[in-house]
Every structure is written in C-alpha cells, then in structure tokens.
Amino acid sequence: MIAHLINTDLYGRNIIRLYLEYRERDFDFLSNATSLFLENVDRVLIVSCFPIPPMQIAETDGPPGALALYRTVEKLGGKAEVLTCKKIQKALKDFKIDFAQTPSIENYSLLISVETPGRAKDGNYYSMSALEIEVSPFDELFLKARELGIPTIGIGDGGNEIGMGNIRDLVCKHIKFGEKIGSVVKVDSLIISAVSNWGAYGLIAQASIEVGKNMIKSWSKEEEKVLKALVSSGVIDGVTKKPELSVDGIPLEVHKSFLTLLNSIVENKIG
C-alpha cells in the first residue's frame, strides 16, 4: 500500500508506468530497501541536492526527505551526516544537522541518495527537460561505495537520479528524453516515487512498521518549517522554478495531506 501511495502521479510524468513495470521486477522493493536501511543505521551518509537550470538553483524536493531520514537514523540509535550544496546547508543551518564536508566513504555503513543527479551514459548530468546541469559529482561516492561493498540506497522520481541506473531500460522506455537523461549509476536498493521526498517518507513509514514505532508522525509540522527555511533562502520548486511553498508543483497542503494518510497507514499497522 505504501509503495502505491508514494507513486501517486499527480502531474502525469509517467512515473506510474515506470513504477508498475519496476514492481514486476522487484515487487518488494520498498521492503527490501527498508531491511537494508534498518540493518545499516550505525553511520549513514545522506546525500541530496538537485540544481534546476538555467540558474542552477537547488530545488525543494530532496532536502526535506533527507532531513526526515536524518532524524529517523537518530531515533534508531545511529549517527547520520548530510552531504549537500552550500545553499541547502545555509538554509538548514538552524536545524541541528551534522553536515559532511569531505566525507571518507570507508567511514560509513550506508549511503542514501534523495533526489541527487546521477550521470548519464555520456558522463553529463541532465534535468528532466534534458538541459545540462552543473553539479558536484556526489554520485562518485556511490560508485566508490559499490566498489567497496558499502550498501547504497537511491531515491528518485524522474530517471536522472543516483540509483536509476538499476532500471535505465525502463527509464528510456517510459520517461521523456529518457535515453539522454537516464542515469547509469546503480545502487543496491532503489526506491522510485512520484516525488522523491515521498520516497524518503515511504521508507520511514515502512521502517516504522517494521520496528513497531511511528517515526513519521511528527514530520508534517517539521516539513513545513523546513520548506519555509528553504524558500526563505531562495531554494525553488523544481517545476514552477519559483521560491514558493511547494514541491514539484504540488502545494504544501497536499504534501501535508499525503503525510496524514501515510501516518494513518502506519498507525493502523502498528496499532
């Protein structure tokens, strides 16, 4: 049910077709990612930042989900750090986050990407509209982690993010400009969702059910605070390209309703 909910395609980007075919290959992808997450929460590096062309300004999708995962790792007794761009760091400076600067991959038990660009087959990075974007090559950390056998989780919603290399053929089939923008970077466990923040929240909700403790319950109020802080610092909605209280063209109130429904599912499952 949670996997269906996080793939509610409100703005028709074909993620639902991608999701349905992906689920035929890996029916339990969310449960599998949750198991990997819960088994490796000792020291987690969470990566998030997606610049939107032409101004290359970071978007509101990704950082809220990254922060929610950061808080969840803390609740589970682990330690997390967030690797992101300077604009996001500045926006979230008052949220008591440990930001990684030059992380050594060997020090982490798990890497998670939430809406972070992954290189395409030509080595460049692209937006959903196939415009080239300027990024810090955070995906190199995931390539190295895979070489070292360090677990990796990728969360994405468009085909051009870290982890979408797992299903690049489906991205080419279902996503506009997929052949050009589709990431080749693979992860151990991939979560796809209609909004990447929702994918992160879905992971937290599934983890809550597994451990019998609701760790998503308070996030609705926190998300609003985070989004306001991001927008106040000039972070933009990736669809409207404006600094407003929305994510991927979806107003804050809809995201709050989504979290309310997700919370209800968790409460019903854990009693």
Regions found by a protein language model. Name each.
Residues M1-R43:
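Positively charged, low-complexity intrinsically disordered leader regions
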Residues K86-A100:
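Active-site-proximal loop->helix
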Residues R43-L45, S109-L110:
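Structural motif
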Residues A58-G77:
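Histidine-anchored nucleotide/phosphate-binding helix
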Residues G77-C85:
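Short internal beta-strands
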Residues G163-G271:
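C-terminal functional extensions of proteins
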Residues E21, I46-P64, A194:
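Short, glycine-rich nucleotide/cofactor-binding loops
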Residues A58-P64, I97, Q101, L110-N214:
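Conserved mixed alpha/beta catalytic, RNA-binding, or beta-rich assembly cores of soluble enzyme
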